[in-house]
Structures are given as structure tokens and as C-alpha cells.
Amino acid sequence: MSSRPLESPPPYRPDEFKPNHYAPSNDIYGGEMHVRPMLSQPAYSFYPEDEILHFYKWTSPPGVIRILSMLIIVMCIAIFACVASTLAWDRGYGTSLLGGSVGYPYGGSGFGSYGSGYGYGYGYGYGYGGYTDPRAAKGFMLAMAAFCFIAALVIFVTSVIRSEMSRTRRYYLSVIIVSAILGIMVFIATIVYIMGVNPTAQSSGSLYGSQIYALCNQFYTPAATGLYVDQYLYHYCVVDPQEAIAIVLGFMIIVAFALIIFFAVKTRRKMDRYDKSNILWDKEHIYDEQPPNVEEWVKNVSAGTQDVPSPPSDYVERVDSPMAYSSNGKVNDKRFYPESSYKSTPVPEVVQELPLTSPVDDFRQPRYSSGGNFETPSKRAPAKGRAGRSKRTEQDHYETDYTTGGESCDELEEDWIREYPPITSDQQRQLYKRNFDTGLQEYKSLQSELDEINKELSRLDKELDDYREESEEYMAAADEYNRLKQVKGSADYKSKKNHCKQLKSKLSHIKKMVGDYDRQKT
């Protein structure tokens, strides 16, 4: 699910304004940053944790698989009905013609000779002459229809009831394998069925081809009115409408299984690409209320620069250290600070800005004690002196707040207004968005580099608390800890941190300009 920090700017909605000449890509940030090309995106559109896959919808890949499985169930029932309706004629053939030579009721020696040939050829062909037995072909078709019916029913039921098994990659791999096997078998069964219900399709070049063609040729040419027609012979030579429908449905089932394989592969790829928290298998409300629009967010930012928020009574250091600072001067109820340590310093004026994209920024806001003075996040000092690690004072280098610097927020805002005045055309809006995307990538790269140092310091701090002071692990971790602290105190680190502050202010200003222009257009 989404984990946007509190009061962070809402995602920009590309459907609010869509010029005809602009069609941003939806998956620009789907892969690695160094692989994907840099294309233009709407302002503040990059929230990878907010990209949700609604797999509960019928239009999603799993939903399409459910629809196709239903269609296969219906088509299997139709095939069973069509093929079963013609079995009676094959039973008649078996009882009257397999035993030997049978002629027509009348017609003289000519028809009698045809009757002998038909009785001999047809009876002999039911297993001895190399012909496909119509009864065997229809039985094969019915068996495959039954297997497809069972498989499609299992896929549909497991998907509709939303079982845990149907939400795994292994499940869709099984669907791919079963669909491929059944699709191939249905294709073979359909071809065999065509050969069985259409004897002329298999008689060319065979031993009894001329006899079968002579028997069935009378049904392919106009016959005289009133001529007696043997119904059994007619159904043997002519493809019935039910049989034609069964053939068409057989090929449609093959196409349906091919589509199931396609969407199952697509589902597996999406499950590999996105995290489980980004996939919704059940319909639910992600947000209780709609996020505020750009205008309200800008007003909140303006109001936040004037009023200092009320101090929290107790704040737990969630990122910088596992220790908690409370208003009464305790650190996890182990260390006490005198009252003069936080009442002797006057309250400085603090500019509080909202975080941009990184969820870690949520923990980087200035701290305030109950006495009203400003406190920066700091590492606690060790309970006792430890060799190899320098003492961490109250003003440690653990603060990662980018809202303080040599240049005030008002001065930065004036600079950005001169550089990025209000938008007056779509071309200018396109230029602003390209600048926003470029700045966003630079900001994310710098902030990721700074965050890595902070995370490593936090990890080493926890390890130092676990190791014995005399151990080699403790000394190695202490050396690395001190080295990273020197890195944080370097001019290069401070320059990057200040540059992140400027980039954040720039991106916020560009977003405001784009939002103002979009509201004017609407």
C-alpha cells in the first residue's frame, strides 16, 4: 500500500489536463533509473509505491482469465450437446452395416452392387481399412470437451473465490502448463473429428477411396425428386450442422486457451515487477478521503512557514537512533538532562518544509521539547566511554533536515519566481515539466546517497550496542562508524545537503506553477 508521509503533496493527476500534443508514458519509472530513457512526465507524478494493480477487476489479466474460463465452460457444454446428438446414427451403422453386405431396399442390381460395396467398404473400414472411425473420433472429442470443462471450471472457481493459491506465481504457472497441454490435445481432437465426420476428407488416395467417393457422390450432386435416401448413409457422408458447430467451437476453445496462456504470462510478469503490497486482489478503499488539491496544499505550505507547530510531548527517534527523547529529559528512562540544558537557549525561528518523495523525510522534521526550545535530532552519548568510538554529543551530525541553511525560504522563492515565472502556454508547461523531471532525478540521486550514510550510521550504532567492547567486531564497527561521521562532517556532504534543499524548493515551485496553469485552463 501507499506510504506517503503525512501532509506530503498529493500526486499530480494527469487527467486534469491533457493537451493533444502531450501523451506521457505510464511506465517511465517502472524499471531501473539508469535503464529507462528520460521522458517527460506530469509534475509530481512519480510515486512508485502508489501504483496499484487492481487484479480484482474483470478487465485485469486475472479477470480476463476468469472470463475466458467461463467461455470455455459454455463451449464445452455446447460441443457435448452437438456431438452427442449425432451418436444415434453411428449406433445404427454399427447394428445394420458392420455385419456384412447390405443393399438398398430397391433399385436393382446397380444399387445392389453399390450396397455390397458400401457394406464391405464401410464395415471393413471400421478398424481394418485405415479409416478414422466416426464413433472413435466423436468419443475423443467428447473426452477432450470433458477434460476442458473440468480444467476451466477449476480455474474459474479458484479465481472467483479468491483463494490464496490463486494469488501465487506457481498457480499461474500451472494454468499456463495445463492450458498448453489441453490446447494441443483439443487441436488434435478437432482434426480427428473432422476426418471422422467427413469421410471424403480422408479417402483421397486410399484403398477404398473410390468406393466411398462413389457412395457419397450422390449426396453432393442434385438428386431427382422422390428418390429414396438412406438416412444412415446420408449422415455418414454429409457433415451435419451440429458437427460443423462442434468443429468451430473446438477451434474457438484452442484460441481461448492461447489467450489464457498470454494473460497468465502477463500476470506473472506483473507479480514479478511489483511488490505484493501494490497488488489488490480484493476491492477495498485505499484512501478514506480524497487528497487535497494543489491550491489547498500550497496554502498549507504558506501557513506552515509562519506558525511554529505545537511541540509533541514525546517523540521517539525512529530513524537516527533506537533511543527515544522525551520532554522530561530522559533517554529511554536511562539518562537525565538538567532543566537548564533546554531552557537556557532562546527559541530560534524555524522554517518547516514538507517532504518531497522519500518516506525517510517524514522523520527529518525539527524536534521541539515541552519547554518550547528547538532541538535537532542527535545521537545519544554512550552510557560509558568505549574505546574506538568518539563520544556522540548533543549536536551530532545525525541531523538530516534539509530545511535549514544559509538562504531563507523567502529568498529561494524569489529566485525561483524570477527563473520560473507563471506559465502562459502549453509549450512553456512542457518545458517546466521536463525541468521538473530532471530535477527530480537529481534530487532522488542525492537524497539516496545521503540516506545511505544515515542508514549505515544507524546500523553501526545498533551493532556497537550489541558487541563487547574488547571484541574485534566492535573495533571494526567503531572505526567504520567514526569514518562515516567524518564523511558527514565534510564540506562535500554539507554541500550536497544544501543542494537537496534548493532542489526541493525548486520542485515545489514548479509544481505550484503547473497547478496554477492547469486550474486556469479548466
Swiss-Prot record:
Compartments, record wording: Cell membrane; Cell junction, Tight junction
Task: Map out region (Disordered) in residue numbers.
Answer: 1-20, 360-407
Q: Which residues carry this modification: Phosphotyrosine?
A: 368, 398, 402
Gene3D superfamilies in alphabetical order: 6.10.140.340
Positions carrying Phosphothreonine are 305, 403-404
Provide the free-text tissue specificity comment from this protein's UniProt record. Answer: Localized at tight junctions of both epithelial and endothelial cells. Highly expressed in kidney. Not detected in testis.
Which positions, given as ranges, span the membrane?
67-89, 136-160, 171-195, 244-265
Q: Which of the residues bear the PTM Phosphoserine?
A: 302, 313, 321, 340, 369-370, 408, 490
- Biased composition (Basic and acidic residues) is annotated at 391-400
Question: According to the UniProt entry, which residue ranges have a biased composition of type Basic residues?
Answer: 381-390
Key words of the record: Cell junction, Cell membrane, Coiled coil, Disease variant, Disulfide bond, Membrane, Phosphoprotein, Tight junction, Transmembrane, Transmembrane helix
Residue ranges, compositional bias (Polar residues): 367-376
What are the coiled-coil residue ranges?
426-489
One of this protein's Pfam families, by short name? MARVEL
Its BP terms in the Gene Ontology are: bicellular tight junction assembly; cell-cell junction organization; epithelial cell migration; maintenance of blood-brain barrier; negative regulation of gene expression; positive regulation of blood-brain barrier permeability; positive regulation of D-glucose import; positive regulation of gene expression
Domain MARVEL stretches: 60-269
- Per the database record, which ranges form the OCEL domain? 414-522
UniProt's post-translational modification comment states: Dephosphorylated by PTPRJ. The tyrosine phosphorylation on Tyr-398 and Tyr-402 reduces its ability to interact with TJP1. Phosphorylation at Ser-490 also attenuates the interaction with TJP1. (Microbial infection) Cleaved by S.pyogenes SpeB protease; leading to its degradation. Degradation by SpeB promotes bacterial translocation across the host epithelial barrier.
Q: How does it sit in the membrane?
A: Multi-pass membrane protein
The entry assigns this protein to a family as follows: Belongs to the ELL/occludin family.
Instruction: Write down the disease named in this UniProt entry.
Output: Pseudo-TORCH syndrome 1: An autosomal recessive neurologic disorder with characteristic clinical and neuroradiologic features that mimic intrauterine TORCH infection in the absence of evidence of infection. Affected individuals have congenital microcephaly, intracranial calcifications, and severe developmental delay.
> Any idea what this protein is called?
Occludin
Originating gene: OCLN
